[in-house]
Amino acid sequence: MPIGKSAAAVTPRRIAVLSVHTSPLAQPGMGDAGGMNVYIWQTSLELAARGIEVEIFTRATSSSDAPIVEAAPGIRVRNVVAGPFEGLDKTDLPAQLCAFAAGVQRAEAREEPGYFDLIHSHYWLSGQVGWLARDRWGVPLVHTAHTLAAVKNRALAEGDTAEPQARIIGEQQVSDEADRLIVNTEVEASQLADLHDVPLDRIDVVYPGADLATYTPGDGAGARRELGIAPDELVLTFVGRIQPHKAPDLLLRAAAPLIHAHPDRRIRILVVGGPSGTGLERPDALIALARELGIEHAVTFEPPRPPAGLAEVYRASDLVVVPSYSESFGLVAVEAQACGTPVVAAKVGGLSVAVADGVSGRLIDGHDPQEWTAVLDELTANAELRTELAAGATEHARRFSWARTADGLLNSYAKAIEARQEATQTVRRRRRRAGVRA
């Protein structure tokens, strides 16, 4: 560890994890639940396994949410009441940050002094709360943005809504105040430095991972039978929230010409996910698009699945398609590759790291449906190439594990704690010197 002190001296005993707008216990693929939920839950499991207590603060969204949930050994989820349980969109939550911050502060005040050693906030809403808690508790704040409004606004999908200026300002404030900033890839580090003027020496690049015990290669025949997919069908799968940003419509538009021109390939499109966001947010809209394109018979819609079920979907697929307009990483891509399924993805953000172009799949620059059709045509016509990419996918995915992610988090935490300790000692020395002179 490139830190001056021993690991024990800079390893937190207990951390407060802030996730205002979505609970790590929620099902990914529905509403606002997605990769961030998976990230928080999996890293919490890894940290708890190393003896670090993790308390996750999230907003209660149901009257049945218990105030405290002992979610796993060493992991406690605190459901904070902040605004009505239902009827609030993520865009409404800035008005509830005061209530949420009050709940966090009151929970900490009921514990002994020095209860938390560090705060790790996720997404800018949580960063605002973490900023206040950091100053109140006198502990370091480590922040992970997961997405940046300015990046998203540069690449809006048709029908999507631009992120408001208030969010951009909020992200700037958190970027200025956090002790350390964690990003998913070197691409995101460059974006954060350029857009928010953050010195690179305050940024730590930590790759997310995949649960390599769950997402493994295997026989997808059982999943195909369950989904009503024939053994000889070529399955192109989209997994994620149904929103313009994720671009599931691009898969339909790109595959439609192939379905019409090559009925012998028996191409099946599988869409796994639920509604979220603005614009093209309901499966009904995609169903209507499939009908318009004349491929309704070849498209299957499935609700989100838990990890074990999702692994079966990946194994049942010949290709997983990730056509997002922006991604800070792309967990779906890594999970699919870990199951031995090649990925066709947009060459944006962290997907250029998550997918090894020509080795574990293909990266496509841009969102022109014709270019996507050409790549899908090549891959659906060449079983040998798909087999080669499948082998490369499994190997590439081994680079990404949650254990390695936890190693990176602990390194960032250590830097933050040590810097805070040194700053405190400097202040004390100055005060002592001032006292002597007095």
From Swiss-Prot:
Its EC number is 2.4.1.250. It is an enzyme of class 2 (transferase). It catalyses: 1D-myo-inositol 3-phosphate + UDP-N-acetyl-alpha-D-glucosamine = 1D-myo-inositol 2-acetamido-2-deoxy-alpha-D-glucopyranoside 3-phosphate + UDP + H(+). 1D-myo-inositol 3-phosphate binds at residues 21, 32-37, 90, 123, 147, 167. Keywords: Glycosyltransferase, Magnesium, Metal-binding, Transferase. Homodimer. This is D-inositol 3-phosphate glycosyltransferase. It comes from Tsukamurella paurometabola (strain ATCC 8368 / DSM 20162 / CCUG 35730 / CIP 100753 / JCM 10117 / KCTC 9821 / NBRC 16120 / NCIMB 702349 / NCTC 13040). The gene is mshA.
